[in-house]
Amino acid sequence: MTTIEDFTSQYGLVQKIDAFGYMKYLAENPDAPRKHGKVVLVTADTPLKASRGEGKTTTTIALIDALNKRGIDATAVLRQPSMGITAAGSKGGASGGGKASLTHPELIDWGLCGEMGAIEAAQNLLVSFAEKAIDDGKLDTILVPRVSEVPSRSLRSTAVDYGKGNVPEKVVLTPTCELMQIVVLSRSMDEISERVSKMIAGTKDGKAVTFGEFVDLWRITGILADAVKPAKTETVNGSPVYVHGGPFANVSIGIPTLVSVEMACALHDVVIVEAGYGTDAGAQKWLDIACREYGAQWPSAAIVVTRASTWRDDPELAWRYPFHVQRLENLDIPTFPLINLWEGEDDQVPSLKATADELGFRTPIIGNLFRDGGEALAPQLDGFVDALQNGSMPAEPHSHKGMALTENAKWVAENAYGVPAERVIYKPGFTESVSEAMELCQSAGISLDDLAFVAVKSPATMTDNDRAPEEERTVALKKVEVHAGAGLVHVNLTTSLTTPMPKIV
């Protein structure tokens, strides 16, 4: 009998799984043994600053350890951390901590099996092809950036073909690039090839030119052959964990690969999906991009992580955590607050429970997960397990395909950030940017309004001024960038950076 082991190979300290092959096998053999796991979304409060985590990965690891301790077959699907960001010291790694850690964290945090490097090489090869197309007269401009996982301000803008027109290029971080998004959203190598062919390389006489018009796509898919396979590792307590895909949540889509989540659902009863940064970032994109536009599974429950200090130490920002919890509850997702304690905060448990009760939350889950791991959670999960086992069927959200870009932006502002449409403002140049994007899409034979909306924003703020009174908060729309191959359109809001390593990423 064919099993997942037939699609698995040892790759150093971890295993690599041919998820495309396994899911194709299941599709062709509907009677083959499989599970139909439920998805739990782990997200967080908006951090006080971008370099400060709330503990989502530590929580995710502790949670699957606790569920397995209770006899529930649970796993987690995590994004691969960016080695560049970790090395530069902007934030910790993405392997948990203390008793809620992955085995071999140094491997996970420092490149895993070369997946990020392969995506970097493949996108840079595409740009090299575009540069050659400039010389061959097939392009006048290049729109796809080079990428690097190591941040560098000096690479913010460059020029190639000096003396032949000084064609401008730019360099962005690998986790923000379009090819990363394509890997995350694709369910087969054929789909990756098709999406790469639709990437807009640049323009000729003002018209879009795609890579499919002049690139042998097998060269790109060949580089990605191992990168498209999820890695399987485990927690220090033996719970299985899959790691695959690494897009940032504030300037990209912030979710693991769809195929890794679907594979995990076929193998386990509960699948914890960790989405990057706060509920206004990765969780919004899981719900509104992965689920709404790409058919990913709607969560059967959610956990919103915060730290006691994030939630309560800054009264002007205290509105954000209840907003996140209530937003998910309003979507009929049973949502559980989780307070990740730090050393010296155990005495705050009674007051934290009282505050949660005043706000009408479900009973909060509270623990020092670094110190105690899953043991701190297991006794507190009765309500959570009951919601998973007895909850209603997950929703099937309607697509926003065809919705005007500006209307989509206003919808996200109102539903994800709490800012009504009348307080969404257009910065100078935004309308022109939309018109240019619309013309570019039309020349490529697609509609701008059919692309899924991606907010590009600061991870540490939801609006232009989160400290302002509610009736004064605004969201500013700045510029638009088309990622046609990935089927996405980026809209810049608030402050965001995609290349350098500032104090706030």
Curated annotation (Swiss-Prot):
The keyword S-adenosyl-L-methionine does not apply. Transmembrane segments: none annotated. SUPFAM superfamilies: P-loop containing nucleoside triphosphate hydrolases. GO terms for biological process: tetrahydrofolate interconversion. It catalyses: (6S)-5,6,7,8-tetrahydrofolate + formate + ATP = (6R)-10-formyltetrahydrofolate + ADP + phosphate. Disulfide bonds: none annotated. GO terms for molecular function: ATP binding; formate-tetrahydrofolate ligase activity. InterPro entries: Formate_THF_ligase, Formate_THF_ligase_CS, P-loop_NTPase. The keyword Metal-binding does not apply. It is an enzyme of class 6 (ligase). Its EC number is 6.3.4.3. Pathway: One-carbon metabolism; tetrahydrofolate interconversion. Keywords: ATP-binding, Ligase, Nucleotide-binding, One-carbon metabolism. Belongs to the formate--tetrahydrofolate ligase family. This is Formate--tetrahydrofolate ligase. It comes from Bifidobacterium longum (strain NCC 2705). The gene is fhs.
